[in-house]
Amino acid sequence: RIPISILSNPTTMIRNDVQVLKDLGADIFTVALDAATPTLFDRTRGKGVNSPHSWKKYWEVLNDARDIFGNQKFGAHIIVGMGETEYEVLTLVQQLVDLGGHSHMFCFFPEKGSLMDHLPATPRDQWRRVQLARYLIDYAGVRVDHMRFDEEGRVSDFGLPQGELDTIIDAGIAFRTSGCPGKFAEDISACDRPYGDSPPSDVASFPFQPIKKDIKRIRRQLNIRKRAPVEA
């Protein structure tokens, strides 16, 4: 049996609709919050673009999904780089984890002809920090309150000893496409969305396992040098 995941439109749904989808065999339910804060949501997905979508309604349906689908079977899409701080988006990631869900993260990449095509793509240093921090919160037991942030809301300390952080960075999984859990490992998404949020020349979410040269580039973008091994 092939697992079925739902990307919903909460604006047109009531709680019973969520139950019907579960009863029909859906396995995972997701909501495209996209924006990390109510203000950004309203500006980019709600009244600011003459849309009926509302932050309150999206969260209402997301909470219905938590009740009906259960732990680890619901989540939310989040786009990084729409004007939020790193602290704000990672606080949202933590909120989802505390509810029992997951975040499926995208790097903002302006599409020609869209209402936001004049905005810059998310800087790679910002994206890599959020990618790494999100992975630590979702899969490594680190909490956002274990991390430190500077006055601009940027991650300055990931809340892990350098050696442990190096191991996670070198594994590369934190920088792969995030989404519904895959067949072989919970932290490797079943959905790889090749180049869905970046050009192939500057990969944001790797649809494949990053190799050594990719990890070196990621480290440069993070500005985190690998700790030299301690001699015995």
Annotate each predicted stretch with a short phrase:
Residues L40, I79-G81, G179:
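Residue-level preference for alpha-helix termini and adjacent loops
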Residues R1-D17, L24-W59, G75, H102-H104:
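Core AdoMet radical
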Residues S8, V80, R124:
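Conserved residues at beta->alpha junctions
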Residues R1-S5, N50-Q72, P123-R143:
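Alpha-helix-loop-beta-strand connector modules within alpha/beta enzyme cores
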Residues L90-A232:
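Auxiliary Fe-S-binding modules of radical SAM enzymes
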Residues T11, K47-G48, V61-Y87, F106-F108, ...:
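Conserved strand-turn element in the central/C-terminal portion of the radical SAM core barrel
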Residues I14-D23, V80-D98:
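Catalytic cores of alpha/beta
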